Amino acid sequence: MQVLIGTKLVTEGIDIKQLMMVIMLDNRLNIIELIQGVGRLRDGGLCYLLSRKNSWAARNRKGELPPIKEGCITEQVREFYGLESKKGKKGPACWMLWLQDRPVC
C-alpha cells in the first residue's frame, strides 16, 4: 500500500500510482487544496487532516480563501462552487472532518 505524508505541498503535481492514503499535518487548507489533495487518491483511499483547532485561524491571511471548517466537507465544496444544497441529506460522498484540540505529534 502506498502512503503519502506531507504538508499542503503534496496537493500539487504529485502522481503516485496505487496511492491509498494521504496524511497532511497541521495544515491550513482551503477547499481548492483539499480537492487537489484528495484527488491524489485512487479507488476509495483515505485522507487524514491532522491539526489543532486554533492553528488555522491564527495563520489565516487577508485575501486568502478561508480554510476548511470542521464538519461535512461535501457541503463546503457545494458552497464554494455555488451548487444547490439538499439540507438534511448526506449522500455517500459526504465525509466529515474533525479537528483535534491538542498538539499534533
Curated annotation (Swiss-Prot):
Domain Helicase C-terminal, chain residue ranges per copy: 2-44
SUPFAM superfamilies the UniProt entry points to: P-loop containing nucleoside triphosphate hydrolases (SSF52540)
Gene3D superfamilies on file: P-loop containing nucleotide triphosphate hydrolases (3.40.50.300)
InterPro entries: Helicase_C-like (IPR001650), P-loop_NTPase (IPR027417)
Signal peptide (UniProt feature, chain positions): none
Disulfide bonding pattern of the chain: none
Pfam families hit by this protein: Helicase_C
UniProt-listed CDD domains: SF2_C (cd18785)
Induction remark: Upon SUB2 overexpression.
Family: Belongs to the helicase family. Yeast subtelomeric Y' repeat subfamily.
Protein name: Putative uncharacterized helicase-like protein YBL112C
Annotated source species: Saccharomyces cerevisiae (strain ATCC 204508 / S288c) (Baker's yeast)
